[in-house]
Amino acid sequence: RQAVKPQVAMYEQFGIPGMMAFKKTVDYCREKGLVVIGDIKRGDIGSTSEAYAVGHLGKVQVGTKEYAGFDEDFATVNPYLGSDGVNPFADVCKEQKKGLFILVKTSNPSSGEFQDRIIDGRPLYEHVGEKVAQWGAECMGDEYSYIGAVVGATYPEMGKVLRKIMPKSY
């Protein structure tokens, strides 16, 4: 199947009408049989992270009715706040059979300011890759995890290292 990745910020800048357009975009793409990756890059903790996860990937109960918010198939998540920020998303993914793409090594020019920092002899992105593999081990599909990684194609050598660290992640 083919996938699309609408960037939510391009819709958010237009306020409520923009968010309504985002929902229409997601619904239209799903009607066409496309996999929808919500490029939301959320990162928060506790109940806030859970609310983002439910709003984009899960269902919320209101009285006797259940609603799916934006209803993407996958969402992008920023892991900077650690497991407190990722676990609520992973829980919703397990429950709803949805997925995540966690930022590991991004392609933007300044990504190395943090992602390439050496910690315990290895770059930070390798440590993040290990956490993605751990989180992913708890969310396995047939062969691959529902938890994947964002790894910029502009860094093929780093990609090879990360593939070894995360062999079951897309």
Task: Please provide the spans of the model-predicted regions.
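Glycine-rich, proline-tolerant flexible connector loops at the mouths of alpha/beta enzymes
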Residues: 5-19
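Conserved, mostly hydrophobic/aromatic
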Residues: 4, 39, 75
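Short coil/turn connectors at secondary-structure junctions
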Residues: 1, 6, 31-34, 70-72, ...
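A C-terminal functional module that forms or caps the active site or interfaces directly
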Residues: 153-170
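Conserved anion-binding
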Residues: 44-148
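Alpha-helix-loop-beta-strand connector modules within alpha/beta enzyme cores
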Residues: 16-38, 164-165
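Domain-level signal for soluble alpha/beta catalytic cores
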Residues: 27-41, 46, 70, 149
